[in-house]
């Protein structure tokens, strides 16, 4: 538990120095359709990606911050779209959906590039975020 608190504090300090994120980077461009696939298969693929630290350059995965629901705020109990403090403070976005949250995390904590909007990876991670959200809300 102490390790998670230390990691959370380090992440907060890291994010505080990141400045801002252009909202256009985390908003689906007009005319670009999402990848369509079986939701169960996408969520299963998303779970593997959730644990993949190679998606970014920071050496962390989604699970690095959120193992066992760590670092989720109470607002995560609400279905998307909803306000996320990190996205609000760094991009002035009042509300974001799960797909946008994936893109935001790709850019900020994971220090990677946003995923292609029509990619299976983005659809899979967004599907798995839905699973994580439902599990967290049920606690």
Please provide the spans of the model-predicted regions.
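Bacterial N-terminal signal peptides that target proteins for export
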Residues: 1-6
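Short glycine- and Lys/Arg-enriched binding-loop motifs that mark or flank ligand-binding interfaces
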Residues: 13, 42
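C-terminal motif of bacterial Sec signal peptides marking the signal peptidase cleavage site
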Residues: 15-17
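Electron-transfer interface patches adjacent to heme c in soluble/periplasmic c-type cytochromes
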Residues: 21-39, 52-139
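Short Cys/His-rich Zn2+-coordinating modules
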Residues: 43-50
